C-alpha cells in the first residue's frame, strides 16, 4: 500500500507550487482535495476525489482510495501550518503519510512586505469563533490571523475595537 501524499499547493496559482509537489501530483493516480485545488487537473485523466459533504466521510473515502492507487491530497499553503494534517494524524499513522510542504500564505505576505516573521504570533480564525482572536493578541509582538469568508479583516477589526483594543496598523 502506498503512502498518502499530503501535498501543500501554495497560496494560489501554480507559481508557488514546489517541484516536489509537482512530482507527487504527476505520480498520483487519484487527486483529492477541495474543488478549487482539483480544478487545474480536471482534464488530466486522473481520478478526482473532491472534498464534499462531511469531512469524516471524505476521509473514509480517502482511506479506501489508498488501496486502489497512488493518492495525493492537495491542501492550501503548507500542510504543516493550520491544515487538515492534524485531522489526518487521527486517522493515519505518520508512516502512512508523505507530507510535502508548500509555501504558506503568511510566507508570501511577509515576503511581499519585505519583513521577517520571527516573533510574530500566528493564529487561525478560519472556521473558528472570533473569540479565539483574543487568545493570540500580545502587546509585545504582532499577530497574523488566517481568515475566511466569514471572519474577514473588517469583521475581526470591528470585533477587536468593540472589545476596547486600540487602533493598530493592519495589513490585509
Label every PLM stretch briefly.
Residues 90-96, 115-119, 162-168:
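A short alpha->loop->secondary-structure connector
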Residues 61, 136, 159:
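Residues that form generic nucleotide/phosphate-binding pockets
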Residues 1-103, 107-108, 126-132:
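Class I S-adenosyl-L-methionine
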Residues 2-6, 19-22, 69-71, 139-172:
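A contiguous loop/helix-start segment that scaffolds small-molecule binding in enzyme catalytic cores
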Residues 110-139, 148:
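Short, glycine-/small-residue-rich phosphate/pyrophosphate-handling segment
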Residues 8-9, 119-121, 143-144:
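Short, contiguous strand/loop micro-motifs
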Residues 86, 90, 111, 158, ...:
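Short, well-ordered alpha-helices that flank and scaffold nucleotide-derived cofactor binding pockets
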Amino acid at each position: 500500500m502506498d503512502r498518502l501524499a499530503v501535498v501543500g499547493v501554495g497560496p494560489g496559482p501554480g507559481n508557488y507550487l514546489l517541484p516536489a509537489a509537482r512530482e507527487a501530483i504527476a505520480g498520483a493516480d487519484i487527486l483529492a482535495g477541495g474543488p478549487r485545488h482539483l480544478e487545474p487537473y480536471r482534464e488530466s485523466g486522473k481520478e478526482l476525489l473532491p472534498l464534499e459533504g462531511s469531512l469524516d466521510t471524505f476521509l473514509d473515502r480517502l482511506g479506501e482510495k489508498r488501496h486502489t492507487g497512488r493518492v495525493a491530497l492537495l491542501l492550501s499553503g503548507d500542510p504543516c501550518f493550520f491544515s487538515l494534517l492534524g485531522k489526518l494524524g487521527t486517522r493515519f499513522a505518520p508512516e502512512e503519510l508523505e507530507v510535502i510542504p508548500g509555501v504558506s500564505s503568511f510566507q508570501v505576505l511577509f515576503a511581499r512586505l519585505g519583513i521577517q516573521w520571527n516573533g510574530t504570533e500566528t493564529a487561525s480564525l478560519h472556521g473558528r469563533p472570533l473569540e479565539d482572536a483574543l487568545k493570540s493578541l500580545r502587546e509585545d509582538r504582532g499577530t497574523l490571523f488566517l481568515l475566511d469568508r466569514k471572519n474577514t479583516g473588517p469583521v475581526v477589526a470591528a470585533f477587536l475595537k468593540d472589545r476596547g483594543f486600540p487602533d493598530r496598523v493592519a495589513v490585509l
